[in-house]
Amino acid sequence: MARDIQLPCDGDGVCMRCKSNPPPEESLTCGTCVTPWHVSCLSSPPKTLASTLQWHCPDCSGEIDPLPVSGGATGFESAGSDLVAAIRAIEADESLSTEEKAKMRQRLLSGKGVEEDDEEEKRKKKGKGKNPNLDVLSALGDNLMCSFCMQLPERPVTKPCGHNACLKCFEKWMGQGKRTCGKCRSIIPEKMAKNPRINSSLVAAIRLAKVSKSAAATTSKVFHFISNQDRPDKAFTTERAKKTGKANAASGKIYVTIPPDHFGPIPAENDPVRNQGLLVGESWEDRLECRQWGAHFPHVAGIAGQSTYGAQSVALSGGYKDDEDHGEWFLYTGSGGRDLSGNKRTNKEQSFDQKFEKSNAALKLSCKLGYPVRVVRSHKEKRSAYAPEEGVRYDGVYRIEKCWRKVGVQGSFKVCRYLFVRCDNEPAPWTSDENGDRPRPIPNIPELNMATDLFERKETPSWDFDEGEGCWKWMKPPPASKKSVNVLAPEERKNLRKAIKAAHSNTMRARLLKEFKCQICQQVLTLPVTTPCAHNFCKACLEAKFAGKTLVRERSTGGRTLRSRKNVLNCPCCPTDISDFLQNPQVNREVAEVIEKLKTQEEDTAELEDEDEGECSGTTPEEDSEQPKKRIKLDTDATVSATIR
């Protein structure tokens, strides 16, 4: 007697028994294996409509008796029934979510047991945290692949079905006249086939991941740190120096305890070595030695200052021909206006106008507020009668009274000019006076007749002469320092670098998640969908945006029914009509898996940090449970900002 064999529908929806393509209302999907079957070809179709909701196909229900086979195949028969029983057990487990059931079914069908999968999960967890930057790239590479070349997409294009492809692969596929997805055979709209749009969110995410990998792959730079206490007494060079002399020298020990942004004279309390402070007339061999005593910290630049804080000191070293030195007052030229690109560090030709910015702005701010500015003169200033014969000399503090701009001696470009007037309690090195300066009238400057952008101080200066005490002093509180005096110890710097490195990896994941942001709710995507115009939205947000809107509009007039008109539903981010896409928006499962993996890595990193903190603090589990835990929590509505503690 001939055996009646029942067969399901194939991948194209064609019944494998009658070779016809049944309509959807004549097809049934198995609740276990999700395989479509032709109802007319079933030997025992469901009796009622309710029974179709949880219908099981003949293969899964075991209604068909197995074909007579040899005894050697009994193992396969028992294995098949065991597989069906295991799938039914998974479906009956109400504690599992739909996603977890799907994963467990996939494990069983792939021949991998639950125990093997658990061991693999343990191995993954054990290896987590070793290289977080590479984990970020693997999260993309494992889940986000081109459906044609199976590589990380280059210029990714997201199709309406939710699958991604390289732009080049997509255009090649479309050029062959194929209008279906290469993975799921879904129809691709004609408009997208002619004008595909690159998914900018995926581009930014892939770029960030590649940058993090390249940064992790490069050899970390070695920092040679020497604390101030361990530095030699004079500037020194090491075997790493490329040039002889002091061209590559490092600074010696700093002897004064002032911050780099200290204004005014250096008193005795800031000189623990000699207990006398910085005296007018002190000389040093070079600028590096001058730096060690705090007179002028930069060993190359002529201006020490900050544009929003003020200038602390200047050096007269003959850098500009415009400078005029008259001892108790001098005209100083600002910095800039020269092309120093490449190896033109000593270029003396003006190329453009100087402006009141950067160091020049710092001098102007000191002029406005009346701050004292320390002045050192170098033997390189050959045009001045007040320059030392050798080395560098400290000449006291000056105050900037005016500043302006004028065309320089080269005759083409403007330079910034400053009038410095001496205001120190100690006599100048070139005088035989026993007392310091007294307030003197501002000298006549002929070049002011041709000056532009002239600025004169209107308010009372912070550093001024007190007639009652007969000395120069701070009439207003000096500005608070913004820089620390003591440099971090090597161990503290090491811990800080570790914290910065850990924060970088956390920030990289946070930045990646920020790229996967819904354009409507501005939160991390949940069930992401990508429109044909390459904009990403949460599926719920997009559906809620167009809730209550129909695809067609019925029209009538005067009792007559007119032809229905299609409603134009524009994308929330651009004028593109996405009404066809909204009929059945497909979730981009690849992007969803990437987001889920990044969130999991974020949570695992937080757990590892908690464990490390517990080990460092030496607390017991009972004590640790009583203490508040520090966690880096990733919400779906915002990304994590890394914090260094």
Swiss-Prot record:
PROSITE patterns, per database record: YDG (PS51015), ZF_PHD_1 (PS01359), ZF_PHD_2 (PS50016), ZF_RING_1 (PS00518), ZF_RING_2 (PS50089)
Stated name of the protein: E3 ubiquitin-protein ligase ORTHRUS 2
Keywords, ordered alphabetically: Chromatin regulator, Coiled coil, DNA-binding, Metal-binding, Nucleus, Repeat, Transferase, Ubl conjugation pathway, Zinc, Zinc-finger
Source organism of the structure: Arabidopsis thaliana
Subunit (UniProt): Interacts with histones CENH3, HTB2, HTR3 and H4.
UniProt xrefs under InterPro entries: PUA-like_sf, RING-HC_ORTHRUS_rpt1, RING-HC_ORTHRUS_rpt2, SRA-YDG_sf, SRA_YDG, UHRF1/2-like, Zinc_finger_PHD-type_CS, Znf-RING_euk
Pathway: Protein modification; protein ubiquitination
The organism's taxonomic lineage, starting at the top: Eukaryota, Viridiplantae, Streptophyta, Embryophyta, Tracheophyta
GO molecular function: chromatin binding; double-stranded methylated DNA binding; histone binding; methyl-CpG binding; methyl-CpNpG binding; methyl-CpNpN binding; ubiquitin-protein transferase activity; zinc ion binding
Disulfide bonds: none
